[in-house]
């Protein structure tokens, strides 16, 4: 696999754009409507928020991906279209209709996504104008603008692209994502849009996306909140001309691993961009009895406010890590645990190890802080990502609606 510059328009046959509709009505000039389209219909799959309260676009798009086919996606930032009742459902459907009309495709082939403030009706006159502007600007170079248009409190757009060989054909995968707050397992944890020119059976695409999501977006946590709006969609248009990837086929594993690598890259970017964050936290758990235990343990440490605050304060308080492991639900013997901060061992076989506080402080001053725990309970391992907890997180979320 080879990494490429770009995002959702890196694969053949995809165009995108971002436009300013001033959805929040503040005249800030921010791009807030994104449009992504393939020149042919695509196999499609999605994963969606586990929050019982689901936004209108989530309900609409989830129903449409059950058919296994989409051709385009329209998304807005600045307004979640969540908790907006029947009018919200009508507005989501109208977004799909307007975008489909501009593209000359059937509305049923449109996915819809929204992100922003909950409980406020969409200003459909502005949204409509934004969709028309985005449609007029569609181009193979528009991926960066689309990635910018889906941002809310993000401090930078998040894109990734990679290519690999499958059956003698070059296959490309591109993606964009947004997210910095309300990021917490389980899926989905943010907005993500993935494109590929691979020929993939819809069932194989669903399986690969679920697997990749479990290894990436479901392994990040910023603040313990799961949004009403989160989704990840993948569209595969088949223009690469590779042998069609089926579940369990010879090429499935290579494709699924490449998809996971792209999503892991974006997941880490989201964790790095956590609201107010100054450091990326990576937690590696090995020696777990089951994969589920490894994932539980890693996520618990990343999600611990005490661990996150200690990392922000550059305090090597490793006891907080062990405490989080203990309440994670993973089964292990605390008397066998080994624990490291970077390359510094903090605990061996359940006993504290003397370490150089100055060296620990140097590790904690880095922009990426890694904890490794060996549970010595089995052979399974997992990695999770998060960020430190800072004063700015409270400032950002204390004034979000303004």
Curated annotation (Swiss-Prot):
Any one Gene Ontology molecular-function term assigned to this protein's record: glutamate N-acetyltransferase activity
InterPro entries xref list: Arg_biosynth_ArgJ, ArgJ-like_dom_sf, ArgJ_beta_C
Principal location listed in the UniProt entry: cytoplasm
Residue numbers marked as site, Involved in the stabilization of negative charge on the oxyanion by the formation of the oxyanion hole: 115-116
Gene3D superfamilies linked to this entry: ArgJ beta chain, C-terminal domain, L-amino peptidase D-ALA esterase/amidase
Subunit relationships: Heterotetramer of two alpha and two beta chains.
Catalytic activity as recorded in UniProt: N(2)-acetyl-L-ornithine + L-glutamate = N-acetyl-L-glutamate + L-ornithine; L-glutamate + acetyl-CoA = N-acetyl-L-glutamate + CoA + H(+)
Leader sequence segment: none
GO cellular component: cytoplasm
EC numbers, comma separated: 2.3.1.35, 2.3.1.1
Function: Catalyzes two activities which are involved in the cyclic version of arginine biosynthesis: the synthesis of N-acetylglutamate from glutamate and acetyl-CoA as the acetyl donor, and of ornithine by transacetylation between N(2)-acetylornithine and glutamate.
Pathway: Amino-acid biosynthesis; L-arginine biosynthesis; L-ornithine and N-acetyl-L-glutamate from L-glutamate and N(2)-acetyl-L-ornithine (cyclic): step 1/1; Amino-acid biosynthesis; L-arginine biosynthesis; N(2)-acetyl-L-ornithine from L-glutamate: step 1/4
Family (UniProt): Belongs to the ArgJ family.
BP-aspect Gene Ontology terms: L-arginine biosynthetic process; ornithine biosynthetic process
Keywords carried by this UniProt record: Acyltransferase, Amino-acid biosynthesis, Arginine biosynthesis, Autocatalytic cleavage, Cytoplasm, Multifunctional enzyme, Transferase
Superkingdom, natural source: Bacteria
Localization (cell): Cytoplasm
Protein name (record): Arginine biosynthesis bifunctional protein ArgJ
Site description Cleavage, residues in chain: 188-189
Residues that bind substrate: 152, 178, 189, 275, 397, 402
Active site: 189
One Pfam family here: ArgJ
């Amino acid at each position: 696999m080879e990494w490429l510059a770009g995002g959702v328009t890196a694969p053949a046959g995809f165009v995108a754009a971002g436009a300013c509709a001033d959805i929040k009505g503040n005249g800030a000039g921010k791009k807030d409507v994104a449009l992504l389209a393939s020149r042919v219909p695509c196999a499609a799959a999605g994963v969606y928020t586990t929050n019982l309260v689901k936004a209108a676009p989530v309900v609409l798009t989830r129903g449409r991906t059950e058919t296994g086919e989409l051709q385009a996606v329209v998304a807005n930032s600045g307004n979640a279209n969540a908790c907006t009742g029947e009018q919200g459902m009508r507005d989501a459907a109208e977004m799909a209709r307007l975008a489909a009309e501009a593209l000359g495709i059937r509305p049923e082939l449109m996915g819809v996504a929204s992100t922003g403030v909950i409980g406020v009706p969409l200003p459909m006159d502005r949204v409509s104008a934004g969709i028309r502007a985005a449609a007029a600007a569609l181009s193979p170079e528009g991926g960066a603008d689309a990635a910018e248009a889906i941002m809310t409190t993000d401090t930078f757009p998040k894109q990734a692209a990679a290519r690999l060989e499958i059956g003698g054909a070059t296959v490309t995968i591109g993606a964009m994502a947004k997210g910095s707050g309300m990021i917490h397992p389980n899926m989905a944890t943010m907005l993500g849009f993935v494109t590929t020119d691979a020929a993939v059976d819809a069932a194989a695409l669903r399986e690969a996306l679920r697997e990749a999501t479990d290894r990436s977006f479901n392994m990040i946590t910023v603040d313990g909140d799961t949004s009403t709006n989160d989704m990840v969609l993948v569209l595969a248009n088949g223009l690469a001309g590779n042998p069609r990837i089926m579940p369990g086929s010879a090429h499935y594993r290579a494709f699924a691993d490449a998809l996971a690598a792209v999503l892991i890259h974006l997941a880490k970017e989201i964790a790095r961009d956590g609201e107010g964050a100054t450091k990326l936290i990576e937690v590696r758990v090995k020696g777990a009895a089951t994969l589920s235990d490894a994932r539980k343990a890693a996520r618990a440490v990343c999600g611990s406010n005490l661990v996150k605050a200690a990392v922000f304060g550059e305090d090597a308080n490793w006891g907080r890590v062990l405490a989080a492991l203990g309440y994670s639900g993973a089964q292990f013997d605390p008397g066998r645990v080994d624990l490291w901060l970077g390359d510094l061992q903090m605990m061996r076989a359940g006993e504290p190890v003397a370490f150089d506080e100055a060296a620990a402080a140097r590790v904690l001053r880095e922009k990426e802080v890694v904890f490794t725990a060996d549970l010595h309970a089995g052979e399974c391992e997992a990695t999770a990502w998060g960020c430190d907890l800072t004063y700015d997180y409270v400032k950002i979320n204390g004034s979000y609606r303004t």
